[in-house]
């Protein structure tokens, strides 16, 4: 009975150490190679309010059990013995669904409850009955009837060298599902992964496992931008250096094993198809990066490459599967075997969230109409009708509008960081050039220091395109602001981009997703934990479209913008021919654009929107949002006071509110008073209570004579703690580690200080009493 009571009183950590871990190891699981404890599989969502950011909680499993590295079989969720054996099951199942794990276990140290994700059945096991790795593996593949060759393929190790990054959970799922599909004989495979989630690294591991197993010996990697191919060879595909080549010109060397090429390089034109230099069965595997950009279009020259090598396994990878009358990824590749969306990436903390600044110019919201018989600056009579954002910079140019946009961009950068990498998306090349000029004039001081502060990077401009590598390089200061049209909508890995400006008309969901993807990469060491979208043309309405972040479905969208498809063989001038990388931009408009000056343009309204915990844009002010969510958790002041007073560590309440998107530091900045205590800030925002400063609360404690309950050194310690609260906040005095720092060192070691209060428990009780006194009024 004594032992039972002892077990019942154990912490969860003790239960794991003394019962669960020994049971798992006793079943044959290798502690070093097959058991991963305290596995954090997300980084915690980045929460943004104002300019303040914080991380949400990371998701974590107690145990993740592997058959082989990166081939997980089971999750074990532990609870202390005061819980039932199955108390952790629901949370474990939720994690198993995310992590693609076939078996789930919950334990309180008495035994295990098992849940089979494939059959849905559950059973209880004793500690001694926990299954071995081989038992679970055979159950997992039992219905598949794999041949030895197939099993060897699906267990082929990942490429790994000491110091290498390890795959994130979603990359591991994408890699394993793809290799499994190939093992089963599937020859058309589609993977959908949001921009910035490591598609190229995922492709590398897939290719390496298939190549190393001997299943695929000749491999083609197709991309549509030179920079994509070069980045791939220099970074993720570097381990293939000795067997890898880039197809250039007409030299096709068949001695390599991995070939990288632009679609355009292999496709050629109607009369010349370089891909035919290879035999149709030359390649075993073709991986198509950004496959939405034309490979699945039935009449495209790129599609002919895929059909020519029809016997090869073909894997399409994209952030934005395209489904229109002309193009269908799904009808060609089939349903995606795995989708990892932008929302998932942001929720997991692997992608940067965004805040949206919507700017309403008066001429955009109200329209503009010429006076009767009005001529433009070139002498053309302007067609008499009302013009709006669909016309601006396409049919009609208002110079003052361009200036107004440039001024607002510049003001934003001056208020935040003038060297924040910025991409301005324009209607066409002509608009991008005029916007460049306007931004140069608004930032002439920095342009005088370095002419590359503002650059136009478009398909027709060799000088601008030459600066693209410098723009995306993390250690390169210039260019800072780039104006563009189509060239930078996809494939540009600019981790440091912190401002995206939309001054173009976007009707294509595919293009919208790709543009937003330019900013979603996190770079905390660069100071980038979120990015801002400045929207002048209401493009962000597409965020509300269920199609924006849902699973891809086969749809018809007659409004899809055909202008985003690149071409390898453009018409004769004045349309610009593509550069060496096949990159093209919009051709100049042949129709005359009216251009006017002397039109007064002003900002009519602005609103800031934040990405909330549900993945939606909220328009409320930080204060209003915080008040609503605090009241959602604590409806009355009394309920909040009860929770605050009953919580031993006040930080737990702060953390809970933070998970709901309430950042007290942002509220403190808005209030303009750094000396307000967290408690007072919450009461002031949510319940309209007049706040006291920390100094006022500390002085009230002293005035009431509370410290005189103690004498000697104990009183001095509490007085020092009260000073610490006044200067730092309640979280500091809750932390026992502060006793190891000044000014407490003069009182002795933490153990010696605790003895002044009768021991550790007495010290903790003294801290609780001090907290009650602090918040007594």
In which residue ranges do the predicted regions lie?
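Interdomain helical connector at the RecA1-RecA2 junction of SF1/SF2 helicase-like NTPases
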Residues: 327-420
């Amino acid at each position: 009975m004594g032992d039972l009571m002892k077990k019942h009183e154990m912490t969860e950590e003790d239960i794991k150490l003394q019962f669960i871990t020994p049971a798992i190891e006793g079943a044959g699981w290798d502690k070093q190679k097959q058991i991963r404890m305290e596995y954090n599989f997300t980084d915690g969502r980045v929460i943004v309010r104002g300019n303040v950011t914080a991380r949400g909680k990371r998701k974590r499993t107690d145990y993740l059990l592997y058959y082989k590295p990166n081939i997980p079989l089971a999750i074990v969720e532990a609870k202390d013995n005061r819980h039932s054996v199955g108390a952790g099951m629901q949370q474990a199942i939720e994690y198993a669904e995310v992590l693609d794990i076939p078996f789930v276990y919950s334990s309180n140290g008495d035994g295990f409850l098992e849940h089979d994700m494939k059959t849905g059945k559950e059973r209880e096991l004793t500690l001694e009955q926990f299954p071995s790795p081989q038992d679970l593996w055979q159950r997992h593949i039992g219905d598949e009837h794999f041949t030895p060759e197939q099993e060897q393929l699906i267990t082929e190790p990942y490429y790994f060298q000491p110091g290498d990054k390890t795959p994130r959970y979603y990359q591991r799922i994408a890699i394993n599902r793809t290799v499994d599909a190939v093992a089963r004989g599937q020859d058309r495979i589609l993977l959908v992964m949001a921009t910035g989630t490591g598609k190229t690294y995922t492709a590398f591991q897939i290719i390496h496992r298939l190549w190393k197993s001997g299943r695929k010996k000749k491999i083609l990697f197709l991309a549509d931008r030179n920079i994509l191919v070069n980045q791939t060879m220099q970074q993720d595909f570097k381990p293939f250096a000795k067997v890898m080549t880039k197809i250039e010109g007409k030299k096709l060397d068949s001695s390599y094993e991995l070939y990288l090429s632009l679609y355009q390089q292999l496709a050629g034109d109607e009369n010349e198809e370089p891909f035919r230099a290879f035999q149709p069965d030359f390649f075993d595997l073709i991986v198509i990066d950004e496959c939405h950009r034309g490979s699945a279009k039935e009449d495209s020259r790129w599609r002919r490459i895929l059909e020519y090598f029809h016997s090869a396994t073909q894997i399409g990878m994209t952030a934005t599967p395209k489904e229109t009358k002309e193009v269908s990824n799904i009808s060609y590749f089939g349903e995606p075997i795995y989708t990892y969306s932008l929302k998932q990436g942001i929720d997991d903390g692997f992608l940067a969230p965004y805040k949206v600044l919507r700017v309403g110019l008066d001429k955009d919201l109200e329209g503009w109409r010429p006076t009767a018989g009005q001529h433009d600056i070139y002498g053309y009579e302007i067609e008499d009708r009302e013009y709006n954002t669909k016309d601006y910079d396409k049919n009609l140019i208002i110079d003052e509008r361009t200036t107004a946009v440039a001024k607002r961009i510049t003001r934003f950068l001056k208020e935040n960081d003038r060297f924040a990498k910025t991409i301005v998306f324009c209607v066409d090349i002509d608009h991008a050039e005029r916007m460049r000029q306007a931004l140069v004039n608004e930032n002439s001081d920095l342009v005088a220091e370095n002419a590359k502060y503002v650059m136009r990077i478009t398909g027709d401009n060799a000088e601008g395109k030459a600066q693209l590598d410098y723009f995306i390089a993390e250690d390169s200061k210039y260019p800072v602001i780039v104006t563009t049209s189509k060239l930078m909508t996809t494939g540009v890995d600019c981790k440091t981009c912190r401002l995206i400006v939309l001054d173009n008309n976007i009707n294509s969901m595919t293009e919208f997703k790709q543009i937003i993807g330019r900013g979603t990469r996190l770079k905390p060491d660069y100071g980038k934990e979120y990015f801002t979208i400045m929207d002048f043309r209401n493009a962000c309405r597409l965020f509300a479209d269920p199609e924006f972040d849902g699973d891809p479905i086969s749809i018809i969208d007659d409004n899809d913008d055909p202008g985003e498809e690149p071409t390898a063989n453009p018409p004769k001038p004045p349309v610009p021919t593509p550069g060496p990388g096949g990159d093209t931009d919009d051709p100049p408009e042949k129709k005359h654009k009216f251009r006017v000056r002397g039109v007064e343009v002003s900002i009519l309204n602005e609103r800031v929107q934040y990405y909330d915990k549900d993945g939606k844009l909220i328009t409320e002010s930080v204060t209003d949002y915080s008040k609503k969510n605090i009241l959602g958790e604590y409806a009355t002041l009394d309920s909040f006071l009860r929770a605050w007073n009953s919580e031993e560590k006040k930080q737990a309440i702060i953390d809970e509110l933070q998970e709901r998107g309430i950042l007290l530091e942002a509220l403190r900045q808005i209030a303009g008073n750094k000396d307000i205590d967290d408690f007072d800030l919450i009461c002031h925002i949510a319940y309209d209570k007049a706040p006291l400063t920390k100094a006022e609360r500390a002085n009230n404690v002293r005035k009431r004579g509370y410290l005189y309950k103690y004498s000697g050194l104990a009183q001095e310690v509490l007085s020092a703690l009260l000073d610490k609260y006044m200067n730092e906040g309640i979280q500091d005095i809750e932390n026992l580690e502060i006793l190891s720092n000044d000014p407490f060192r003069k009182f002795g070691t933490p153990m010696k200080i605790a003895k002044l209060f009768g021991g550790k428990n007495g010290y903790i009780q003294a801290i609780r009493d001090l907290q009650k006194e602090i918040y007594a009024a």
